[in-house]
Amino acid sequence: MKAQRSFGLALSWPRVTAVFLVDVLILAVASHCPDSWQADHHVAWWVGVGVAAVVTLLSVVSYHGITVISGLATWVRDWSADPGTTLGAGCTPAIDHQRRFGRDTVGVREYNGRLVSVIEVTCGESGPSGRHWHRKSPVPMLPVVAVADGLRQFDIHLDGIDIVSVLVRGGVDAAKASASLQEWEPQGWKSEERAGDRTVADRRRTWLVLRMNPQRNVAAVACRDSLASTLVAATERLVQDLDGQSCAARPVTADELTEVDSAVLADLEPTWSRPGWRHLKHFNGYATSFWVTPSDITSETLDELCLPDSPEVGTTVVTVRLTTRVGSPALSAWVRYHSDTRLPKEVAAGLNRLTGRQLAAVRASLPAPTHRPLLVIPSRNLRDHDELVLPVGQELEHATSSFVGQ
């Protein structure tokens, strides 16, 4: 992986035009200042020139993909806001909906006219009841291209689909310390540990978050019973397309949506969090988010993000966002690491820091409807021949110590 340059220029025409008009306004005000302010050397005028220069630099110079003035404004807003209220926005109570001729009950969440549903993807060792499930691949993998095909389903157009993968490292102690994993049954954390002979099973869970704007699907809604029925139809169709390829898929109910919220937050307690410029500080440690350079989004990179060679990392949350750009699917990715201490530089090598946007990165991974994208990062087109896959196995063997006495 290779990180992009820390500093750059944001020279889009709307931005340059806006900055030019602001500079003209500043200089006009400076030139009309009273003579008592000008003194003998046009002090007010040169102060205006300096202010205009500073505004221009802050508006067009970008740092890690965001302009300096935007990063500062976002950080100040997050720092002054209540993290609990910010992260809880959109996490409204969901309702269960079943179509008239549908088979599954799907949980649907609504907020500000936007809808969200969730699909859980598993390794499928025990297929869902009532389904003739078989796995075509010996290794459970989620093909990203197959997920991207669900963005447009006949008359239904989805705003985006997020692939959210949560991996918790460590043994029984690490699992019990994470309050977000209470829904994972206790028997799943049992392990036999002996001094000098310890094998720890990492646990991974993967969800697909489907986002829909009803205003873009007026014709589709008119052909169905309700707004929820339209999203449920798209959810069921994507489940049928994915189930049995190389993994198992099932829709998430309303009660399970709350559990997904807790799992994605990991050990992050919103009411005890403090947004920082480079990380989130909370009572249980640090949460640090990075975005991935678009050209580096490959199967190997996604696997490396989930399993960093760092004992400090306890939980990893990887989000791959699929959207439609000029008629073709585009993808972007970011990752969040939870650690007891600040992350070493080796873990962040090749990644781009989400400076000033740490709280937005956490909220963007939650299955909560939003009126506009909370996190805008560089993306690339998803090509038809991209063999991009994401592992979805729930248990990953990870040796954490040497074997003694063999």
UniProtKB/Swiss-Prot annotation:
InterPro entries: EccE_dom, T7SS_EccE. It comes from the Bacteria. It is found in: Cell inner membrane. Belongs to the EccE family. The lineage of its organism: Bacteria, Bacillati, Actinomycetota, Actinomycetes, Mycobacteriales. It is a multi-pass membrane protein. This is ESX-5 secretion system protein EccE5. The chain crosses the membrane at residues 9-29, 43-63. The keyword Cell membrane applies.
